Amino acid sequence: MSKPAEKPQGERPTGGKFLGYDHLHFWVGNAKQAAGWYTSRFGFEFFAYKGLETGSRDVATHVVKNKEGVMFAFSSPYHNDNESQKEMNAHQALHGDGVKDVAFAVEDCVAIYNKAISRGAKSVQAP
């Protein structure tokens, strides 16, 4: 097991203060059931939905939100043999239910992005 760094690594960015978490996106076997668990047990409220009724033929996503504004999005594929859901199905088979990505709320997204790129990060999508 590795030890956490005792000192900050590198200089702190001058812009782009971390404000909190915006959302976590979970890939799960049953999005509706997972969202229901968080609303019935932890005080989250239903916030948004994407699925068959909204025109999505591949994935269902249920979004819940807590009182602090943090959102959890739960997504599950409708089919396990669809090419468009290949990554999601492979991830589910290997790991089971879990967090796929985390989004932070920040003061200046562009400053943080530029600093990360200057330190060698690879861009997935520019802000």
Describe the role of every protein-language-model region.
Residues M1-K32, D97-V106:
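N-terminal beta-strand motif that seeds the catalytic metal site of vicinal oxygen chelate
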Residues S2-Q9, A31-A34, A111-N114, K122, ...:
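Amphipathic repeat-derived elements
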Residues P8-E11, F46-A48, K86-M88:
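Short secondary-structure boundary micro-motifs
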Residues Y38, N89-P127:
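Hydrophobic or amphipathic alpha-helical targeting/insertion segments
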Residues G51-E53, D81-H91:
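Membrane-interface interhelical loops and short amphipathic "cap" helices
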